[in-house]
């Protein structure tokens, strides 16, 4: 299950809930519909230990701050989570989700913490279901001891969020972007931020990096890695990251850089146009308010600017109305983990792959 694919209507213009308009399995690309379909079982990811408490931050070279990151790899899928404390209570496990433009909290936990409503609730729709989202205000909260600025969160009841042994929220790019640049170190199991929070990214005009001359701080890259341009789209209370992906050297496809997606996904139209070879495998994946089944296809040769990606199985699904915003896929943690670490620099509009 991809924890980060379930808040599509909360994250402005970002799909983090695969299959928001999928009503059935559509096996295309390789004619695999004639074969018996094997549906992979849902997986459970490890969560950060509660024993880490609310203050496990350390200062490292260059003044950067480092916190533990739980990286869990199960059956080819990869997820990362961190401990968040709210109002001195917790810790609570949150998915580290760059694909979530707006951070989200389980509705039951929000009520238990008495988080005040920050506006009217709204209705969202998924596959054969509807739900209600409520903006709430959070004042004092922290990431493993790193103080976070007060802001609004989206409270909602989502599949595989808030139950026993499940995370209780998504820590999104609205928070991560305020640190300027972050290093997600899959190999070391750490999240490193460049320093204290800055104000949110201003303006609502998308920009493509690299912007400026400085780039990511050496305290995060250690002078290594390959720089890849990103398209950053800031909006009030939300941020999205996009990267150009090519299959077989073909046309550029706009993918969201989505650590909350435990498996990478391509839109059905992309899979068809690029003739991605189908399989007889499928996975159960969560949308904003339901769990659906999507086919798996072979990526074949694929790449981002300056970097060849590792061939693998990826999900294929119809993104529905979200595709109207230009989203054609999700570059998930299953692929990003193969590079050992990744640095995301929001102001500069670049990603550095280890």
Q: What are the language-model segments listed below?
A:
Residues 2-354:
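Pepsin/retropepsin-fold aspartyl endopeptidases
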